[in-house]
C-alpha cells in the first residue's frame, strides 16, 4: 500500500513537470502541415522588416533584408544587395526575384532614408520607389506586389515625424492605385489616439522599431487583405 502511494506521488510529479515543459515550448511557425497564405509571403524592406526575423511569427526565410538591416530608398535602391535567406548569398532584389519567383512580395520601405531626406521632394521618393517596382516586375512578372505603408513612429522619434510618414504613405497609396496593386494600411492599426506609435509597440529609444506585439498586429491587419491578395495571384 505504501509502495502504491509513493508510486502515485512520483507519477503525479512527473506528469506535472512534463505538462509545464510542454506549456513553455512555443511552436515554430512552420510546425503545422497545413499552410495558409502567410507561409507564401516574402517580406522585403528596411530595418523594420529585418527585425521580423526575430520578432514576428514568420520563418526567417520569408524575410529579404540587407546584411546590415538598412535598406535606403535612394538612387542605389536597385543596386542594394539583400541576403538570400536560404543560401546567404548577396543579391540585388531583382536577382533574388528572378531566382526565387516569389508568388507574393510584401514591400515596406522608406523609414531608413526616404521619409526624412525626401520630405520636401516627394517626387524623388516616388521615383526611387517606382524604380524598385519596375526591376522586380521585369525580373518576376507573375509576382504579386503588395505595397504596405510605412509604420508610424513613437513620440521618442527625434527627426522623423508621423506627418512625414503620412505624406510618404499617400505617395505609396497613389502608386498602388495607379499600378493596380494592393496597398495595405498598416499605419492606422499601430497608432494611438494621438497619432503616434503605441508605446507598447515601440521597442527602441529612437521611437522607430517595433515589438513582437506590434508585428502580431501587422500580420493580423495583413490577414484582412488576404482575399484581395489571393485574387491578384489567381
Label every model-predicted segment:
Residues 152-234:
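Catalytic His-Asp segment of secreted/periplasmic serine-dependent ester chemistry enzymes
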Residues 34-127:
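Conserved SGNH/GDSL esterase-like catalytic core that processes O-acyl groups on lipids
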Residues 129-134, 169:
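Generic structural signal for well-ordered alpha-helices
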Residues 1-44, 48-54, 229-234:
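N-terminal secretory targeting modules
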Residues 108-112, 136-166:
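Active-site segments of SGNH/GDSL-like serine hydrolases
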Amino acid at each position: 500500500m505504501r509502495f502504491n502511494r509513493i508510486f502515485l506521488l512520483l507519477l503525479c510529479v512527473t506528469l506535472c513537470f512534463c505538462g509545464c515543459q510542454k506549456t513553455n515550448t512555443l511552436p515554430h511557425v512552420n510546425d503545422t502541415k497545413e499552410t495558409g497564405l502567410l507561409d507564401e509571403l516574402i517580406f522585403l524592406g528596411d530595418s523594420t522588416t529585418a527585425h521580423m526575423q526575430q520578432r514576428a511569427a514568420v520563418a526567417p526565410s520569408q524575410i529579404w533584408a540587407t546584411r546590415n538591416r538598412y535598406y535606403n530608398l535612394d538612387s542605389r535602391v536597385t543596386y542594394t544587395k539583400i541576403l538570400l535567406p536560404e543560401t546567404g548569398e548577396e543579391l540585388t532584389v531583382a536577382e533574388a526575384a528572378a531566382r526565387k519567383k516569389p508568388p507574393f512580395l510584401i514591400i515596406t520601405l522608406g523609414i531608413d532614408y526616404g521619409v526624412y531626406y525626401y520630405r520636401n521632394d516627394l517626387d524623388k521618393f516616388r521615383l526611387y520607389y517606382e524604380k524598385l517596382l519596375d526591376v522586380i516586375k521585369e525580373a518576376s512578372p507573375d509576382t504579386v506586389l503588395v505595397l504596405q505603408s510605412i509604420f508610424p513612429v513613437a513620440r521618442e522619434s527625434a527627426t522623423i515625424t508621423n506627418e512625414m510618414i503620412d505624406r510618404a504613405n499617400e505617395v505609396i497609396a497613389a502608386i498602388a492605385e495607379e499600378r493596380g496593386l494592393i496597398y495595405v494600411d498598416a499605419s492606422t492599426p499601430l497608432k494611438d489616439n494621438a497619432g503616434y506609435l503605441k508605446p507598447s509597440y515601440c521597442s527602441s529609444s529612437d521611437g522607430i522599431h517595433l515589438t513582437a506585439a506590434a508585428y502580431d498586429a501587422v500580420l493580423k491587419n495583413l490577414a484582412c487583405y488576404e482575399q484581395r491578395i489571393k485574387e491578384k495571384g489567381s
